[in-house]
Amino acid sequence: MLQAYRQHQSERAALGIPPLPLDAKQVAELIELIKNPPAGEDAFLLDLLTHRVPPGVDDAAKVKASFLAAVAHGDLKVGLISKAKATELLGTMVGGYNVHPLIELLDDAEVAEVAAAGLKKTLLMFDYFNDVAAKAKAGNAQAKAVMQSWADAEWFTSRPEVEKKITVTVFKVPGETNTDDLSPAPDAWSRPDIPLHYLAMLKNTRPDAAFKPEEDGKRGPMQYIEDLKKKGHLVAYVGDVVGTGSSRKSATNSVIWATGSDIPFVPNKRFGGVTLGGKIAPIFFNTQEDSGSLPIEVDVSKLEMGDVIDVLPYEGKLVKNGETVAEFKLKSDVLFDEVRAGGRINLIIGRSLTAKAREALGLPASTLFRLPQAPAETKAGFTLAQKMVGRAVGLPEGQGVRPGTYCEPKMTTVGSQDTTGPMTRDELKDLACLGFSADLVMQSFCHTAAYPKPVDVKTHRELPAFISNRGGVSLRPGDGVIHSWLNRLLLPDTVGTGGDSHTRFPIGISFPAGSGLVAFGAATGVMPLDMPESVLVRFKGQMQPGVTLRDLVHAIPLYAIKAGLLTVAKAGKINAFSGRILEIEGLPDLKVEQAFELSDASAERSAAGCTIKLNPEPIKEYLTSNIVLMKNMIADGYADAKTLQRRIEKVEAWLAKPDLLEADKDAEYAHVIEIDLADIKEPIVCCPNDPDDAKFMSEVAGTKIDEAFIGSCMTNIGHFRAAAKLLGGQRDIPVKLWVAPPTKMDQSELIKEGHYAAFGTAGARTEMPGCSLCMGNQAQVREGATVISTSTRNFPNRLGKNTNVFLGSAELAAIASKLGKIPTVAEYHEAMGIINKDTASVYKYLNFDQIEEYAETAKGVTA
């Protein structure tokens, strides 16, 4: 075991990273060695046991905790580890399998004080809190000391306060850094291995940067960062715009691996550090908070690569060479407590533990923690989003949560996909979670099913049981895109989250998050939220012939640019949507599948969430269909069946008494954007390579197209019918066309209706239902290609290396595929004539209650 470990250690050292944490088998072998240590290995063996085993409810932690408990109880005698040392080591394991033995050891006079010292710093107590409280009540002195320590928040006060002056060396990345730059999609397989994944950060050459990757497209500027650290300070990540794009916490993990410090007793994880950005995207900001980092929005124009600066967080100043070069205000003073606690999640759990202990001891509420500033009183009404969150925190019906209020809304629905799922699994283990408190948690395999690596196959095999054993619902590889499924399981006007930035509920509201916060939401059933402001987009008038919903999606950034609320340039970036909720009105009769196209794209606006005002009829139609789908899932053996049955009953209860929240007429918005549909007479595209760079199609007509992609969560069955009709049986189209339906249900119906024949005739490459090209983590288009795509975003290098990607509708992609270029307005409208004649049958959605095989199967499923 030692020989193999040292070999692995040297291989990783050659890469400049530490070895992997020990797994359960290695820990079992390590324990045998500790019982009979080879000569000269004592210190090494103890170091492995102390520092290289994951905490929480990891399988390896279970083996470690069982061994240490046996030694601490005196059932097993080991020369290297005394009873007291074993108890001390149990106290470093964060929570989970170590907690029960520590509580038992409070009754052992020999080690009770050591056990108490460990429990005082253990936050993940959950129901075990009651066991300690009971011992204290029964007179156990050490249990009383633990309760008092929790009440006094010694877990918090024992940690250093945020320094008044933090000296850092600047690592500046000019322009926009998106999460694809920090955590590239093709390297998604390595995300759970934080140090290894870090090596891919900034691996693609950036012409405007002071650094170069060590191997273009493979390894980022790691040595450059190490050289900056030699100035003797932590490195701060600095950029004009930081963290836009996907919700992946792996982006924050990589930044903090460069800028933070090791977490004691937790292998291969770091916390802390400083990130400075002119704009910091909201989900990235949150994952920074969760990781104990200090994210600061500040003008960075006077900072240069390699500068040594002082960050004065309490004064709100950046000082360079004795001169103040920028001033800032922290998002909230609570950030100081989050950093001190080692992260926002630690702070929330710890504050709750302290409150519980004080209540049990009959003490008043603690005044130790900083509280968020309550917003100013106002008599204004509430927006739809504010009312939804109000209901989720238990306010009286019709009351809402004002912007700026800190709250913890109930998470009714939580989603996890397969490139973030393995990280969410690890975070759930770290949180000692053995069962979900959120009402419904769903796991998908949409990003890796088509072209799995060995590590993906392992995930496909192991993750479903991990999720369903905790009461979640696990999809299967090939089922399709997480969002297209999760939307089918939603309850109106409820709140949720998901480990993917496109978790944007078309009914209700979701606040997508990184894997740490998703794990917290799934485990505890609530999620921390500083209620954002809202921006209202109001459509008016009638859609014009040939104009699609995707064009309305792109109209939002286009009209925001016209109103001065959005700029494409990154320096001094303006984005009125960033960190706010996008609320959409004026299209109340959209089908829910159509509404999702609008809510989904709020991710590209960097909005915190999205609501859409819909009439009851389309929602009733959708939910009636969804009950049949969920019954089919139960019949097909999807687990956890009890969770699906519970959701069916809740949907049926809503349908029996349909009731929708509505915004008050006097609700306040940060901005209101009005879009007159009569003014949109042609498609709107987003130009390479920025989803904010929206233009009318006529401005780019004639651009040669090499490849086209019709797929992603932005599509539904209607788009594929339209594309098949527009291809019109043409052979040998001049463009390489990729087609990927969002779910297996869409695929099945499209095949049945004969549309796959049209794709085949055209020579299209039809992909397994799922994400396909959209994330760029598996298949990609040819290097340097110009592409028209229905995917979510067109960041540089996302669909393929050095590509130029236009975002547009499925209809436009099909027409461009036939012509080999972006059409003129006349060419477009001529082609769309065939669709305009038959919109009712083309844009007909999947109503499972009206599809015979689904309806028949559902009849056989009873509660």
PLM-predicted stretches and their roles:
Residues 2-31, 36, 335-348:
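Amphipathic alpha-helical packing elements
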Residues 45-52, 89-90, 118-123:
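Hydrophobic core/packing positions within alpha-helical solenoid repeats
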Residues 39-64:
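An N-terminal, globular interaction/scaffold subdomain
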Residues 17-21, 38-40, 57, 75-78:
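Charged, low-complexity interaction regions
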Residues 92, 98, 102, 114-863:
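Fe-S-dependent hydro-lyases/dehydratases of central metabolism
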Residues 42, 79-83, 112:
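Residue-level detector of extended alpha-helical repeat arrays and alpha-solenoid scaffolds
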Residues 68-87:
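Alpha-helical adaptor scaffolds
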Residues 24-31, 55-74, 94-106, 125-136:
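Amphipathic alpha-helical scaffolding segments comprising HEAT/armadillo-like alpha-solenoid repeats
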